[in-house]
């Protein structure tokens, strides 16, 4: 998710390609009114936690695999549901061989919502909504330096019984086909 949030994180030194990151992050308010999740007071009693482990390797068949998690206790959604956890897990792999790069990524969560962290993560009765998604991508760099690529991604948010006819976004998908030519080291023509 591309939400901005304050955090303190520690990343281990690289241990022959293996590394871990653990962090404590600013709590998010899942009950805030308005169009986006909020970092103000309300259901922000406890900090969130996140972490990731990864392994990278080099050579003719270079790549990286990773797995991560997010967890935050959420309080005050309803009087009957005083406390619950929002959780998410992710896994991914990226590999390169010669001029070809392949990426696959997936995630699954409960109470984390979609579009923005904790946005629409719970229904009005305080029940968690399940979310999952991922993407696949393939790119190829031709000898002139131009990169050709295709990518497809999907993000889903499941309904609960209290959601009938509420207009909740059920699924977002995106297909991208592109050509990217470097004009300078830091500027690409798309």
PLM feature spans:
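Outer-membrane beta-barrel biogenesis signature
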Residues: 1, 146, 181-190
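Surface-exposed coil loops of outer-membrane beta-barrel proteins
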Residues: 1-49, 118-123
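Detector for outer-membrane/organellar transmembrane beta-barrel domains
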Residues: 44, 51-178, 182
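Aromatic-residue hotspot detector
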Residues: 18-20, 46, 160-163, 190
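Short active-site-adjacent structural elements
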Residues: 30-32, 75, 158-161, 186-190
